């Protein structure tokens, strides 16, 4: 987590904003694992079909949440709260990809990672 993030971190009484701050922290920590400086892998490379792949990931997380809600006991690994935080972060990835601003995204491809059609 960078110093700039710490300086601009919002302080307020709304728990929902606190959750968003936790999601930011989680996203930054996970990105250090998945897109570390020693790797050639960029974030956009995880989503071969662009936003469609991100939608698949969100759907997978929603199914996991449903499964956890229907279970009788506590989960062994990822909690329901963790799952919802992941959904929030995947939604931010979708918006980033739609804007064409995800790290490693090709500017000549659309939000589905298909070559852009040139207009005549």
Segment roles from a protein language model:
Residues 1-120:
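Intrinsically disordered, low-complexity regulatory regions
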């Amino acid at each position: 987590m960078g110093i700039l993030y710490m300086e601009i971190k919002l302080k307020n009484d709304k728990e929902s904003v606190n959750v968003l701050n936790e999601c930011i922290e989680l996203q930054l920590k996970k990105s250090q694992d998945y897109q570390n400086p020693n790797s050639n892998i960029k974030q956009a490379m995880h989503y071969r079909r662009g936003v469609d792949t991100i939608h698949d990931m969100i759907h997978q997380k929603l199914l996991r949440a449903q499964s956890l809600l229907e279970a009788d006991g506590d989960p062994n690994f990822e909690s329901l709260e963790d799952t919802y935080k992941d959904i929030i972060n995947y939604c931010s990835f979708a918006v980033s990809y739609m804007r064409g601003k995800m790290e490693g995204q090709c500017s000549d491809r659309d939000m589905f990672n298909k070559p852009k059609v040139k207009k005549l």
